[in-house]
């Protein structure tokens, strides 16, 4: 809100909160809107009186990636936005990613694709962004980085159990299923 003259929001999306999206559209004069949920999209159309520049369903969100956009913030949780994630990277746009699941499940493929398309994936989650910044500014001069976890599939497990955790167990997160 403090930088409306410096930054312009070209497109915005939501799953179901069409009323909040409509308020944001009005405040920031957003031209293109995407709504995943069909019922929410119908309600949005009733509220706004138009379906012009409205894209319905996650499958259509990639149509919002246009030349007039420099950075795309992806903040859809889970694995449902994986195709959108790939489309953003293929477009060469900078991807601000507030989603851990896409990186954890397909990180090497996404990073390789980003290099091929000469773009960046910038993690927005605070811990991941801190690591990203350290790696960017120190030219990968670290031998190892340890990330602590607050729960997931290992919540309430004893330290002795954690010594033998497999990658398969680690991705079996109760929320990511």
Located regions from the model:
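Active-site-proximal loop->helix
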Residues: 1-4, 23-24, 105-119, 134-137
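Conserved anion/nucleotide-ligand pocket segment
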Residues: 128-177
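Redox-cofactor binding/interface segments in oxidoreductases and associated redox assembly factors
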Residues: 35, 73-75, 147
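A short helix->loop->beta-strand "cap" motif at the edges of active sites that frequently abuts
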Residues: 29-31, 50-53, 91-94, 117-119
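Beta-loop-alpha module in the N-terminal Rossmann-like domain of NAD(P)-dependent dehydrogenases
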Residues: 56-88
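N-terminal Rossmann-like dinucleotide-binding module
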Residues: 1-31
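Short acidic-hydrophobic, aromatic-tinged amphipathic segments that line or gate anion-handling sites
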Residues: 34-36, 53-60
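Rossmann-fold NAD(P)-binding glycine/threonine-rich loop
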Residues: 44-47, 78-91, 100-120
